[in-house]
C-alpha cells in the first residue's frame, strides 16, 4: 500500500526542517515542496518563481499518484483544495499520514517568518501568515485529520518539537500534552 505523507502547519512552524529530519527516518525519499522547488528555479528571487513552482508541485503530485509511488508534501492546510486530491489518493489505495506542526499563536508564526527573511529566506506578508494560521488550524480539525488514516501533532513552539497527540480515522486519539491539545482546540474555536 503506497503512502501519502502531508506535513502541515502555519508558516514559520518549521515544517520543512521537521520534514527533512523525519521523512528519511520513515523511508520517504520523495518530498514535494513548492518552496524548495521555487528556490531551485530562481534562488535570487524565490517569490517570482512561486507560481511556477506551485504548478510543478501539482504535476509531481499527479505523477506520483499515477505511478502509485510513496511521496510527501508540505502545506499550511489553509486551503480546502487539497482534500479532493487526498480522497483520490485514498481511492487509489494510498494510506494518508498527516503530521501537523503547531505553534502557540500567529504572532510567533509572524516572528519566525521575519527571522527566516533576515537569514535570507522567503517572505510571506504578516496578514497572510495570520490568515493561514487560523484557516490551517481550523482545516486540520474539520477536514484533514478526519481524512487521515493516522495523524500526529507536534508542538514546535519551543526549541525542539514535542509530541502533543496522535490518532486517525479508525484510531483512538491519544493525547500526550492535554493542556496544549486543549489550547489548539480553543484557538480553533476563536
Q: What are the roles of these predicted feature ranges?
A:
Residues 19-69:
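Conserved substrate/cofactor phosphate-moiety recognition/catalytic segment
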Residues 49-103, 136, 140, 152:
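Glycine-rich phosphate-binding loop used to anchor ATP phosphates in small-molecule kinases
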Residues 94-140:
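A glycine- and Lys/Arg-enriched "phosphate-lid" helix/loop adjacent to the NTP-binding pocket
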Residues 15:
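Conserved lysine of the Walker
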Residues 6-9, 75:
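The Walker A (P-loop) glycine that initiates the GxxxxGKT/S ATP-binding motif of P-loop NTPases
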Residues 1-4, 67-69:
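Pre-Walker A (Motif I) flank of P-loop NTPase domains
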Residues 12:
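Walker A (P-loop) phosphate-binding loop of P-loop NTPases
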Residues 142-190:
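NTP-dependent small-molecule kinase module
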Amino acid at each position: 500500500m503506497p503512502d501519502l505523507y502531508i506535513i502541515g502547519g502555519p508558516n514559520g512552524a518549521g515544517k520543512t526542517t521537521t520534514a527533512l529530519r523525519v521523512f528519511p527516518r520513515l523511508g520517504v525519499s520523495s518530498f514535494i515542496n513548492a518552496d524548495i522547488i521555487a528556490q531551485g528555479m530562481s534562488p535570487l528571487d524565490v517569490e517570482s518563481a512561486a507560481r511556477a513552482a506551485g504548478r510543478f508541485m501539482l504535476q509531481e503530485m499527479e505523477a506520483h499518484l499515477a505511478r502509485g509511488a510513496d511521496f510527501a508534501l508540505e502545506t499550511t492546510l489553509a486551503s480546502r483544495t487539497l482534500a479532493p486530491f487526498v480522497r483520490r489518493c485514498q481511492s487509489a489505495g494510498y494510506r494518508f499520514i498527516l503530521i501537523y506542526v503547531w505553534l502557540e499563536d500567529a504572532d510567533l508564526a509572524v516572528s519566525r517568518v521575519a527571522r527566516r527573511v533576515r537569514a535570507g529566506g522567503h517572505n510571506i506578508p504578516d496578514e497572510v501568515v495570520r490568515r493561514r494560521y487560523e484557516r490551517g488550524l481550523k482545516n486540520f480539525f474539520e477536514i484533514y485529520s478526519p481524512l487521515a488514516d493516522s495523524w500526529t501533532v507536534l508542538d514546535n513552539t519551543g526549541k525542539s518539537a514535542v509530541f502533543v497527540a496522535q490518532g486517525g480515522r479508525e484510531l483512538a486519539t491519544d493525547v500526550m500534552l492535554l493542556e496544549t491539545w486543549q489550547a489548539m482546540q480553543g484557538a480553533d474555536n476563536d
